[in-house]
Amino acid sequence: MFYTRSSLRVCSFKGFLLCSAVFVGGLNATPAMSADVAEDEIIVTGARPIAESEAAALQIQKNADSLVTVAAADSVGRLPDQNIAQAAGRLPGVAVERDQGQARYISLRGAPNYWTTLSFDGINVVSPEGRDARFDSIPSAIASQIIVSKAVTPDMPGETVSGNVNVITRSAFDYSGLHFDAKAGTGVAELGDRKQYEGSVVVSDRFKAGEGEIGILVSGSFYERGMITDNFEIDYERVSQDQRPGSASRFWAQETENKLYRLTRRNWSASGRLDWKPDSTNTISLRSVYTIFKDDEARDNFRFDLDDRQNDLAANTAACTIAANTTPTNTGYADVCIGNTQFQGTVYGIDIRQRSTLRAFRQSIFTNTLTGDHEFSEGWKLTWLGNFTESKDDRSSVGEASWDSPSTRTLRPTVSYDFTDPNVGALRLFNTVQLSSPTRYQAGAAVTAIDTFTKPLSSLTILDAVDTTKAYTGKLVLARETEFLGGEATFRAGFQFDQRTKTVDESEIRLTTAAQFTTAGIPTDYNQFSLDQSFLGKIPMGYTFRYFDTDKMEQVSATARKNFTFVPNTGNIFDVREQVYAGFLMGNAKFDWGSAVGGVRVEHVKNRGVAVGTVAGVSGPVTAESSQTLVFPSMHVNYNVDDTKKLRLSFNSGAARADYDQLRPNVTVNDSNQSISGGNPAVKPERAYGVDAYFEWYMKPQGYLMAGVFAKKVKDVLYRETRTFGSDALNSNNVDRSAYAFSGITNGGDGRIYGFEAAAQLQLEPWTASLGL
């Protein structure tokens, strides 16, 4: 079992708006002067875009038939944040997980992030990474509203367990005529003095087309953010050789590392929408959204392999007298007898594993939808749509050079560690001195510059890796409006088909010999591959270092590509296809006392995975197939206590399926992280059944109070097991992978999640007005 403690220092920004311009034709025409107004009198009219957007969001939330929370763009179409994760993170019950300080994943009410689905205009979109929907690749500039549904209804896919984030794209019909909106801004990151830039533009117009009307909207956005980040990470483990009294509760740091980043992140988006309303009862819409997230990252990684020689410690269950010993016969790792503890101690002559990595990471989503809404006869409505989405996750690495300590103990560092402060991974480095009669080790002179230690080049890896997911969706919904039990009701019957295919293509050039290094033009001495650049971060590390030269890495990579051939990583290549046939029945009834929504969704899921596997020493294609039928009932009741207060009760269900890479019938090897991950095509989805009880009070002039409780019972919880691989079956190219960390997905029994949520949004004006402000 492995545990990780980490700390990350991120950028803070000082930003300012350069310009923001809006032109709205036909919206703000100057009113004609009335006869009783003097010609020299000036009339001033005002608008409050932010207040208007908040009011619109609260109105949508109040009128919703299930539990939702909404972020709406202001009257000129702006959300206050750069990406969807940041914008949604302002809403109650929405937490964001960050990478390098930037909001990336969304968790609803404390649930796992893969329980949250992403959709554009109601169509679920597969993230480039898979079921863990990433929201940092989606600029908020494309959205007019963000609707977060916390209670699942039958028209939502069954994989929506904790909720859905629905990005409502802009339409020309959001505006009364010609509309132009542009924004530009810049700022500076204080850590590392890095610049950031932002800009967006939206143009739309409406045109008469016979008896109907056509609306056209196009938009684009760009965001760039330079960053310097620094961190430390500590991975803990149980050590089998530590058998002394109290060992059951002791977890030792197997390694500690610093990751020091220089990076630039960019977002682009382009969207277009064509809406045609031939008459008041028919609408046909073509929508397209293309987003790109690019991360150019240079990472200097120093990993101190504290458990490098843990087998030197003899397992002994007897109690010992604890006494400081600065000349042990072993490394001192996990040895309580010499005075070492989990959080303080000294380890003698251990390995430094240094990585210099230059990445050109890129993710994109290209989603296209053709949809139509048609009202016919009396009370009948037909909605149809077709969607194609292609998501790409380009994980390629320009180059990664590995520099490792030699096997000679006296050429390796002695490391003194102090982890008592959880915010600092304090280290001190020393030379290692070997004593004789018997052989013992002690700390020599203190070392500040880590690059004075011998760390010859051990490998150079160039990776080309692209994961492509192609998804097709077809949906047909027939609705009937009618009277029901004294109220107005809408009954819906729908069918939906989804097919998603994820294909992984991965190959690499891996150089490990001196002759290959010479051909590629990379020096074996790190100091000849580094810059004379002082540390740009601020985290205290206990040593100094030199950044690697990114220009030299690009040159070496280009030379290696010309002289060596990429070899497919067959163990990491797979093709997984998922088909979902779904049907649902639901009813929505509105009464004087409130409303009710209920129904059932049935899904038949078919999975097929193809990969290269090794069976009895023979490698070849392996195909695994599975199928299952799942039923998802739900019921939501909304009671109007009065015109301003609502009580919401709901029961809902869902099923979180394992991610596509977890369903593959093979294993994936990552030499950089020394990890192996395996697929499990037979793993079952985790089923969730939940209840919610919420009270909402909408207050004047504008605001609301909300409090509620929620609970979910989960069956067949998806559990990621982690252990030491313990086999030489995957050893190759003189690389021993038996000690790598192996992880795989499995079902781990039942569980539950429950909690309490409260939120308040109030206007300060009634109080500030009384103060004369």
Regions found by a protein language model. Name each.
Residues L91-P92, V125, I138-K183, T229:
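A beta-strand signature from Gram-negative outer-membrane beta-barrel systems
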Residues G177, R244-S247, T256, R265-V289, ...:
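Surface-exposed extracellular loop regions of Gram-negative outer-membrane beta-barrel proteins
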Residues G192-T346, R353, F361-T371, P633-H636, ...:
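Transmembrane beta-barrel wall of Gram-negative outer-membrane proteins
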Residues K277-D279, V289, T389, D467-K475, ...:
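Structural signature of Gram-negative outer-membrane beta-barrels, strongest in the C-terminal barrel
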Residues N316-I350, L411-S459, D505-N572, G726-T746:
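Flexible glycine-rich, low-complexity coil/linker segments exposed to the extracellular/periplasmic environment
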Residues A711-K713, N731-L773:
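Gram-negative outer-membrane beta-barrel transporters
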